[in-house]
């Protein structure tokens, strides 16, 4: 399902004809498109109405199954649903800030997706978060990454298995679902962070699902150094270049780091106080307070 109205500019395929991307030139962003509530308001019961609206609007792809992290079958039902209302990825947006600015839509989204399961809806938030939803229990998690991952939450609250499938969904998709059932129209806006050592002005911006990063990042680079653009974080994102230079479906940030191909002769035998190291094999590992400008170089 296309997130907007427009005409197809190109269809890009990779090895073995795998589909890489479909490029759509947007004709009119102010056109809200189809009113899905008016289109399907005769469908009963309510769960089938919700399911049909999500499928036709394309928001069904907001859900991912565990195990396997696939978009669920339209006729399937999960044991439980996990709403990830927090984020611990490096340089990620503050989930609380975005949710509180769209709190009514978020609450409506949680209520609607709860119809898709007979089990629990686990809304997982960071410690001391003020997010509360009437008639739904919230669960707090604390600590560094991966404390904000849906897989971590599932491990402690309702572990999936071959016999039991659970679904996860991000907080911005829940907000979009809430807006769909309030207004009837698909909301394709997303808040993402432009971040990383090569970002000239790191900040949060509003953009659209699948936005062209070539357009989004004009005049956003700190200098002329070779740059690796990552849709997502440095831990879980994908390189966005060429036919894949677009904001990923589940990405909440765009990270800019230096494309570093420097090779150091006999680097393993030098103390290298200015090179980052996790293991205590370089002097820098003992300087806990020192900050490093990380690049794409894995240093072996």
Predicted regions and their residues:
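Buried, small/hydrophobic-residue-enriched core segments of structured protein domains
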Residues: 12-215, 219-300
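Generic structural motif
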Residues: 1-10
